[in-house]
């Protein structure tokens, strides 16, 4: 049985052999450009690593592979506007039937948004390998920023607002951090979630100002251990953010009301002026550039490298972010091309989120996510601690080891096993038809490499082959064409998905 304590012991030594720098990865005998590293790149930029994608990457240099995925992601188009984007929410005094009809339609629109989010992470409905891989990475980066600029399902209950919020995150997924901070604060979801609607001259609401400093830009404490701001800064910043409200009819548009704006002088981070919304975001990046770069840089390192990144590497990434004037594209390219990223100590060093685990299993077994799967998928990821549009609070999900506890670990294993039972009908026969299937150990090793982010020892592979394919006897008695071969292979796949290593990426 998989328990939390054994799971948390199951990991690589935390010490990398590469230096904490952005020096590019150069394949060598000690660190070859092989299937394990190609899968590592695919799992960190997408939701999984299929054999044909691995082969395609290995036909390229690692530098070219990163370029194709990341630059394609950057060039992916905006989300197409749904047909319902202009529909207005009925007024509160509208007949009950009209209001209920809108609620029913809105629920359907929200379901469309869930389906679209899963499809994009899987790269579905995108033709061409690198367009598909690029779309999956764009979706991953959108999800990354959704866990940074957090708004919850209470505000997303209006589908138009959710679409605008996700479209804004997607637009800035690999863009400029400063621009992202500016634009996300003027979405209806964020104004509603952090009480911008009630922030007005003479009666400021400090919620958004506080989270803008603490969670969206610099954090409470800088890398040198000193406070980044004071309560007075929060109060003055809140005054500068007054005047903006959401539409009262469920539209995505936000409005500036000069009568609600505090036009007096404010002092923020030691600077004084008649600041408004458009003034204070550049001011924060001017006065706390290093602190913001470090705060965001550490999050990028946690996303791509490991949950507790090397502080020296965080400093290097933060410095590069500063040098690039907070443009993400060159920074992400540098991180993913670095020897530090490809260091063996970082392969399989991150724990999959519930959404990554469930969608990754669908992806690994070639199973699409259909409309009928949506509620089941959402219910299961919620039980494991993640509802894709509904983070627990404004801090978002904690990630890493926080995903694993006594209440979630059995669900994570059980749901993975269930997906094996519902793999496409062709998966088992196609696997048994592969040339490698003639050798039970070789087949076991191949499946371990394909489905696990962490390479097992030779003894572990032997044990799996012996327990499930050989059935405790010699290779002579293994025949992939036999009547019981499918049953044995199914048993092996269940065993693989029950391993702690399957929870990693």
Where in the sequence are the language-model features?
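Solvent-exposed, amphipathic alpha-helical "stalk/arm" or coiled-coil-like segments used as scaffolds
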Residues: 111-115, 119, 138, 142, ...
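Flexible, low-complexity segments enriched for small/polar residues
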Residues: 15-25, 29-34, 39-50, 289, ...
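Short, charged early-sequence alpha-helical segments and their helix-coil boundaries
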Residues: 64-93, 184, 335, 416-417, ...
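N-terminal accessory alpha/beta regions
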Residues: 37, 41-172
């Amino acid at each position: 049985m998989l328990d939390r304590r054994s799971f948390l012991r199951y990991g690589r030594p935390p010490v990398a052999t590469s230096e904490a720098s952005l020096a590019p990865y150069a394949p060598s005998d000690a660190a070859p450009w092989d299937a394990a590293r190609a899968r590592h790149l695919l799992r960190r930029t997408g939701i999984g690593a299929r054999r044909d994608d691995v082969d395609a990457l290995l036909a390229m240099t690692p530098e070219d592979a990163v370029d194709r995925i990341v630059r394609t992601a950057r060039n992916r188009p905006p989300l197409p506007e749904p047909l319902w984007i202009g529909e207005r929410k009925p007024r509160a005094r509208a007949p009950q039937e009209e209001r209920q009809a809108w609620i029913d339609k809105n629920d359907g629109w929200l379901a469309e948004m869930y389906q679209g989010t899963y499809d994009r992470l899987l790269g579905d409905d995108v033709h061409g390998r690198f367009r598909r891989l690029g779309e999956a990475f764009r979706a991953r980066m959108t999800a990354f920023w959704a866990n940074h600029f957090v708004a919850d399902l209470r505000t997303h209950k209006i589908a138009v607002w959710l679409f605008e919020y996700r479209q804004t995150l997607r637009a800035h997924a690999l863009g400029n951090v400063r621009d992202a901070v500016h634009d996300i604060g003027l979405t209806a979801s964020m104004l509603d979630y952090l009480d911008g609607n009630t922030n007005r001259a003479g009666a400021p609401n400090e919620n958004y100002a506080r989270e803008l400093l603490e969670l969206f830009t610099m954090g409470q404490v800088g890398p040198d251990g000193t406070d980044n701001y004071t309560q007075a800064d929060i109060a003055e910043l809140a005054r500068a953010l007054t005047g903006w409200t959401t539409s009262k009819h469920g539209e995505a548009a936000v409005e500036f009301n000069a009568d609600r704006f505090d036009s007096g002088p404010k002092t923020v981070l030691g600077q004084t002026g008649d600041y408004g919304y458009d003034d204070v975001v550049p001011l924060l990046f001017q006065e706390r550039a290093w602190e913001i770069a470090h705060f965001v840089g550490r999050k990028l390192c946690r996303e791509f490298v490991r949950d507790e990144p090397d502080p020296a590497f965080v400093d290097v990434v933060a410095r590069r972010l500063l040098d690039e004037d907070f443009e993400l594209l060159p920074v992400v390219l540098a991180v993913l091309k670095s020897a530090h990223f490809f260091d063996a100590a970082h392969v399989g060093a991150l724990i999959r989120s519930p959404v990554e685990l469930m969608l990754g299993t669908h992806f690994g077994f070639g199973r699409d996510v259909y409309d009928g799967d949506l509620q089941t998928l959402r219910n299961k990821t919620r039980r494991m601690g993640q509802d894709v549009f509904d983070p627990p609070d404004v801090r978002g999900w904690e990630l890493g080891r926080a995903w694993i506890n006594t209440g979630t670990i059995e669900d994570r294993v059980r749901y993975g096993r269930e997906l094996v039972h519902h793999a496409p009908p062709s998966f088992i026969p196609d696997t048994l038809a592969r040339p490698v299937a003639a050798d039970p150990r070789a087949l076991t090793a191949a499946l371990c490499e394909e489905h696990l982010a962490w390479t097992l020892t030779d003894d572990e592979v032997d044990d799996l082959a012996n327990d499930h394919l050989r059935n405790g006897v010699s290779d002579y008695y293994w025949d992939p064409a036999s009547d019981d071969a499918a049953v044995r292979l199914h048993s092996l796949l269940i065993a693989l998905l029950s391993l702690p290593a399957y929870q990693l990426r």
